[in-house]
Every structure is written in structure tokens, then in C-alpha cells.
Amino acid sequence: MTETFQHISVLLNESIDGLAIKPDGIYIDGTFGRGGHSRTILSKLGENGRLYSIDRDPQAIAEAAKIDDPRFTIIHGPFSGMAKYAEEYGLVGKVDGVLLDLGVSSPQLDDAERGFSFMKDGPLDMRMDPTSGIPVSQWLMEADLDDITWVIREFGEDKHARRIAKAIVAYREDEENEPMVRTGQLAKLISDAAPKSFKEKKHPATRAFQAFRIYINSELEEIDTALKGAASILAPEGRLSVISFHSLEDRMVKRFIRKESKGPEVPHGIPMTEEQIRALGSANMKPIGKANKPTKQEIDMNPRSRSSVLRIAEKL
């Protein structure tokens, strides 16, 4: 029996409004997920509008296959390939809006078999696309102490990174222990390794699980490439709407928009003519409004939306 997992799209209306959808426009949803944003975009498009959605999760692709609409195309792959896909479909410079809903979807978190959650025991996997790459369990068996520490500290911002890494290495080096292949095993190990003074409201494994997921899926590299790709394929006045779910993601998006909205930096003291400065280029995008956060009502309905932030930019 197949269990059905519900996904509630976060900041749905705000992110779609941010795209300023034109009925005959061309749009890309870089993260189809379970289709909440894509279906809403389609509902606002006219007969000549087009939507291209991307996802690397086979379950998302299966969900997208249920949409029987000639205006809709689903692409199986990472959103970092957006510029390549746009080139293949002849969309470069013609896209009126790109939506990116970063992070893990609720169905991925709630499905124990995907291995994302420390709340439900399942295979220690965490891959967005289970058909490629290696699971977290294999990486933890092979990585050295310094690498594990770095990943937890860099991507989980966990001050107990070294302590957790030592516990993982000690566990795997004890021949009497069973191989660590379950999320429950890792969650318990991290909880046991946490200092008795641990007072955070979050589960002790929260940050480490986030770190391993980000690392195994190269999430930050994917985001960086996707943001650059989106900027390169948008038409003038095309919109970029990005929802992030933790500080690492939001900082990347904020810095990207800030960088794209500035003109070229000319080192102080270097003599240049106006013509030479113009030749360096100008600002590529402009931010639209301030960062959006979910309302109390949305948070009450969907607690997972609490940390989400929406940023919108427009191509110049």
C-alpha cells in the first residue's frame, strides 16, 4: 500500500504574485515538488502561455505526469541545469519568470524511506534523486573525522560539530556495532553525543541532518548555479521569485540579488573614462520590494513555513 504525503506550498500567493504573470508569458518552475506552484501558474496562463517545470526527484516527475496540459512541460533534472534546458528549448532571453522553492518538500521529509528525517526511522539516504550519487550512510562510512566535522559546521552551523563527528567515527570503528544505515541510528547517536547542557528547543540532530542533506545533494552549489542560470535566461522585466528555508540559502539569494543589482565596481584611484566604465557593463537586476515572510496565519496552518523567506528580483 502506497502512503500519500501532502505538501502545502509555502508563500504560494506571494511568490506567484511576485512573478507578475502575463497570460501569454513563458515561465519556469525550477522546483516542481508536488506541483502547488506549477498548477497555480498554469491557472493564470492563457492559451499561448507556457510553463516548464524542473525536478530531480523521480516522485515529483511521477506527480507531474498527471498534468495533461499542452502548455506544460516537465524536465527531469537538477535546477542547476536551467540554463542548459532553456537553450535546448530555445528560451534564452524569452523567459518571463523563474520560481525557485528551495529546500526539502514535506513529502520528502514525511516519507521515512527517503531518509531525510530524524523523526522517522528509515534508510539513511537523503538523496533528492535516489538514482544518482551515494547515500549519506556510505559517505559517513568513508569520510574522515575532519571532513565530517567541516560538513556539520559549514552546512549545519552546529557548535558541537567536532563532538558529533567524533561520535560517528568512534561508532563505525567499533567492530561490535552494526553498520549505521538507518536514520534512527544516526539520530540516537547524535542525541547521545550532545552535551547534557544542550538547551536548544530543536532536536540535537536537526543541524547535523541538515548539513548531511545539503552536502550529499550539493545544494548550495546547485542554488548558486541556478541563480546565475535564471539571470542569464530571463527576458527584460522578467521576474525571479525565490523561497528559501534556512539562513545559508537566504544569505546566498540576498547576496546574489545585491550583486546583480549593482553596477561594476571600479577600484578607487584607477583612472577610467566614462566610455570605459560603461564597457564594463551595468546592473543586471533590481530587487522588488523587501523580503517576504509568512503570516502568523500561514505559520499556524503550516508550521514548516516558519523559517521561509521570499525574495523577488527583476531583470533590467
Swiss-Prot record:
It is an enzyme of class 2 (transferase). GO terms for biological process: rRNA base methylation. Its main location: cytoplasm. InterPro entries: RsmH, SAM-dep_MeTrfase_MraW_recog, SAM-dependent_MTases_sf. The keyword DNA-binding does not apply. One of its GO terms (molecular function) is rRNA (cytosine-N4-)-methyltransferase activity. Keywords: Cytoplasm, Methyltransferase, rRNA processing, S-adenosyl-L-methionine, Transferase. Specifically methylates the N4 position of cytidine in position 1402 (C1402) of 16S rRNA. Belongs to the methyltransferase superfamily. RsmH family. This is Ribosomal RNA small subunit methyltransferase H. It comes from Vibrio campbellii (strain ATCC BAA-1116). The lineage of its organism: Bacteria, Pseudomonadati, Pseudomonadota, Gammaproteobacteria, Vibrionales.
